[in-house]
């Protein structure tokens, strides 16, 4: 969540997708209504169901369940096709000008990107992402095209990828009325103008999918294109409350992070602290500080026993075994006898978790 709830009063347009703000997050709705009353803000509701939020929305787009990513892809295409993006923001504060390796490719026939291969360990398609990397000069600086006209720059690759997301195609996929799509796209993309602020609100209706991460990334891409990040009334705002998602991540209760949002060590790929730092430290961006965070964490855990001579106690830190221990995978392991017991505390996974039918089947 990038903005706080009372900041909503500064928004010009709200998009509520994958959530029911009026019913499930009434305090946030208070600030939405304040913006509507004081500055004439508009509310778009995207939902398969006519919820209480949809009932009071200025524009309601009824889509089929599970087609959020198509709807958002259509919005991205509309922004790009009609040049509604905030050009100054996109050029200076996103990677749109960056040049990608020339051998990057996307196959429209099978929907796979370059580098795809069958991973026998995961029994699924994985990617060698080398072709996705940026072009760099001799000093390892990313090559850029400020005009964003080079066919290998991120902006042109984005345009090409989303060019098939026409209103006609999106209407066919989502079942939404083309006029409602057009109206919602036009209204929300208007926030790409200087001095305007668009706010996207979402909840579990966006995240609880096998492609939930892609849904949220699509939301983020919309806001970056429109320059709606880092401003009052803008942002990508998850409506928290269910299952305390924020707390579970901030407190590192999930298997894919340790405190400080650090990737967990892996006994196969990062058996030593040197391996971890080399693998998990990017060449640029805020996470170049990751080695400092890891050492600070080890010192906090092990105190004076952690020092440079013993890798600051890195070998004492539990490590992943390379297998999938994510939420769904754990329950699948129950059905295969790998997990033989479970203590369920203050949770009802048969109801509140994703793929509830599969949850109940796996537990049996």
Each model region followed by its residue ranges:
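Extended redox/cofactor-interaction regions of prokaryotic respiratory oxidoreductases
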Residues: 1-32, 41-44, 70, 154-157, ...
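Short acidic, glycine/serine/threonine-rich loops at helix termini
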Residues: 26-29, 54-58, 72-74, 100-105, ...
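Secondary-structure capping and boundary motifs in well-ordered enzyme cores
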Residues: 49, 67, 162, 189-198, ...
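Long, well-ordered, tryptophan-enriched scaffold segments
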Residues: 51-191, 282
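Short, hydrophobic/amphipathic alpha-helical patches that form generic packing surfaces
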Residues: 73-78, 218-225
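Acidic/polar loop patches that form or flank catalytic/metal-binding clefts of enzymes
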Residues: 84-89, 180-181, 197-200, 229-238
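A glycine-rich phosphate-binding loop feature that marks nucleotide/adenosyl-phosphate handling sites
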Residues: 92-97, 187-188, 203-205, 235-246
